Regions:
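A solvent-exposed interaction/effector surface
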Residues: 1-212
Length: 212
């Protein structure tokens, strides 16, 4: 049976609908950076998702290629994730989507090296006749965070975020969003096929002990 990150690491991908504190270890990702409204059908976000999955599936199917990855095992491609920010805003202003800056990512299994990643970019570009130059290998050490499962529309996320922040403060922590530590979302539902009120999204914010 294929390894499923969501099931094997439930503390990171399947939190409860009540906030919790978690320490997230360093992970490697396929990443594409961009800006603008993610709902724009002609925008960079939709293109970025296509690039991410192009590399993700090239790596997953590498077992059938001449490039054999050391330590490879069958796995389910992890869910799409995103880091979001806006210049001059702490957190996220959902009413002004045009000002979004984002890094769209998909997690890589630990056995994938930078060399394996570079092979996948070259392989995907040759096979799909696409430009994959925007895709990068991102190592990210998220650390101490508060997180919660949000059920519902993306536009309703502020209510869940407020629950997270209230919980965080009760536990003696404070928000630690910086230019390196960002608002993080993990998308467990396909927005194209799921009613808005049923969308499942993990929301995660970086925190630190209050006063430190």
């Amino acid at each position: 049976m294929a390894f499923d990150f969501k099931k094997e690491y439930k503390e990171f991908y399947m939190p409860k609908r009540t906030p919790s504190i978690v320490t997230v270890p360093k992970m490697n990702f396929i990443a594409v950076r961009g800006s603008g409204d993610p709902n724009d059908e002609e925008g960079g976000y939709k293109q970025a998702i296509g690039l991410l999955y192009g590399i993700a599936f090239t790596i997953r199917m590498s077992k059938k290629s001449s490039h054999q990855i050391d330590g490879y095992f069958d796995y389910v491609v992890p869910p799409l994730e995103g880091f979001w920010w806006q210049d001059g805003v702490i957190g996220v202003d959902y009413t002004n989507k045009d000002s979004f800056q984002w890094i769209s990512v998909i997690r890589l299994p630990d056995f994938v090296t930078k060399e394996d990643f570079d092979w996948a970019v070259t392989e995907a570009a040759a096979k799909k006749k696409q430009d994959f130059s925007k895709v990068e290998f991102l190592a990210y050490d998220e650390g101490l965070c508060v997180q919660c499962m949000h059920i519902g529309s993306y536009d309703d996320e502020p209510a869940t975020v407020q629950l997270m922040h209230d919980f965080m403060e009760q536990k003696g922590y404070e928000l630690d969003i910086t230019d390196k530590r960002l608002h993080h979302e993990i998308y467990l539902s396909d927005a194209r096929k799921t009613a808005p009120e049923k969308l499942r999204t993990v929301i995660r914010h970086p925190i630190k002990v209050k006063g430190r």
